[in-house]
């Protein structure tokens, strides 16, 4: 059935306008984004099929370009639109952290860092720079690729800390494998960075690792001491 023949309250776009985006299912949200279906499948049927194919909305959103554009009903235009939409969301989240108030809990920090890194298909390393009251100054991704002592340069982390006049920082990186437990390289890298930053009186408060589940705090698990 053509979606235009549905009752108005059941059409995804009208439902969103009447009840808000939070009332929509993943299928309906994707249908609103796609806008139209393909021959023989309305947009809701297309959306449902895509979610089945990719396994979840998250996996669809995190799919690489080749996998995304190869699906019927998708393509480079929709891929670029989706990437722009995701980046808008990330930037909105970043700017929503008010500099005037410190992050109110370690859990809030972990949620923020997970939102900033979980979409990355490859390994990345970043820093959340903080002032003397542990209020956020800036978040930056500094390195991409395999994260180990050979690819993360302490002098660059020190330089960025000086640029932001940071008094403390929180290190973070993701594990695309989904496993959050730190490797020996992760531990050694963290200790090396702590020593380097101590020379300019900048404290490393934690190193957060982002995987599929809850973000892991190396301090809370005893791998390092703040």
Swiss-Prot record:
Pfam families on file: RadC (PF04002), UPF0758_N (PF20582)
Sequence positions that bind Zn(2+): 173, 175, 186
Record Gene3D superfamilies: Cytidine Deaminase, domain 2 (3.40.140.10)
Record keywords, A-Z: Hydrolase, Metal-binding, Metalloprotease, Protease, Zinc
Keyword Protease appears in the UniProt entry: yes
Motif JAMM motif: where in chain: 173-186
Keyword Hydrolase in annotation: yes
Span of the signal peptide: none
A GO MF label: metallopeptidase activity
Domain MPN: from-to ranges: 102-224
Biological process terms in GO annotation: proteolysis
Highest taxon of the lineage: Bacteria
NCBIfam families: PRK00024.1, radc
Similarity comment text for this entry: Belongs to the UPF0758 family.
Protein name: UPF0758 protein Pput_5194
Taxonomic source organism: Pseudomonas putida (strain ATCC 700007 / DSM 6899 / JCM 31910 / BCRC 17059 / LMG 24140 / F1)
Upper lineage: Bacteria, Pseudomonadati, Pseudomonadota, Gammaproteobacteria, Pseudomonadales
């Amino acid at each position: 059935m053509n979606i235009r023949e549905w009752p108005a309250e059941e059409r995804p776009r009208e439902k969103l306008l009447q009840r808000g985006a939070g009332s929509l299912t993943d299928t309906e949200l994707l249908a609103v984004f796609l806008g139209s279906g393909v021959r023989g499948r309305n947009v809701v049927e297309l959306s449902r099929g895509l979610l089945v194919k990719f396994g979840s909305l998250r996996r669809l959103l995190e799919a690489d370009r080749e996998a995304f554009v190869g699906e019927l009903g998708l393509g480079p235009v929709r891929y670029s639109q989706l990437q722009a939409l995701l980046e808008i969301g990330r930037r909105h989240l970043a700017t929503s952290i008010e500099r005037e108030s410190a992050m109110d809990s370690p859990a809030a920090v972990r949620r923020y860092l997970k939102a900033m890194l979980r979409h990355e298909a490859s390994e990345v390393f970043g820093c959340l720079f903080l002032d003397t009251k542990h209020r956020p100054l800036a978040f930056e991704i500094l390195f991409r690729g395999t994260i180990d002592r050979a690819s993360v340069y302490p002098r660059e982390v020190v330089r960025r800390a000086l640029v932001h006049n940071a008094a403390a920082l929180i290190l973070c990186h993701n594990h695309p494998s989904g496993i959050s437990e730190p490797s020996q390289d992760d531990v050694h890298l963290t200790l090396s960075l702590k020593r380097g930053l101590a020379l300019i009186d900048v404290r490393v408060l934690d190193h957060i690792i982002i995987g599929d589940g809850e973000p892991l705090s190396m301090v809370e698990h005893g791998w390092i001491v703040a």
